[in-house]
Amino acid sequence: MPLVEHALKRMYFQLDTHRKTGVTVIKLIHGYGSSGTGGKIRIAVRKELAAMKAAGKIRDYVIGEEFSMFSPVTRQILVACAQVRGDRDLERHNNGITVVWL
């Protein structure tokens, strides 16, 4: 589990750092797991983001598979940060990423 713990520590650091500098949206690249079916880091990151959202520490997040113009959260993120419209993973259903709205 040390790899997962290390990944979560890095995530917390990056979210805090970017929030302090005024960034509103950040894309986390956590991968999807070496077999394409596992992904302990992906699962842990998304579980922690759900807890952070429930605690009011982040506004919202959208998983890569749902990072699409058809997603209400994605549309809200685009209003908050128009630059996201040019993100290469938009509409690609990439399960190796998660977009976080700080």
Identify the function of each model-found stretch.
Residues 1-102:
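Long, charged, low-complexity intrinsically disordered regions
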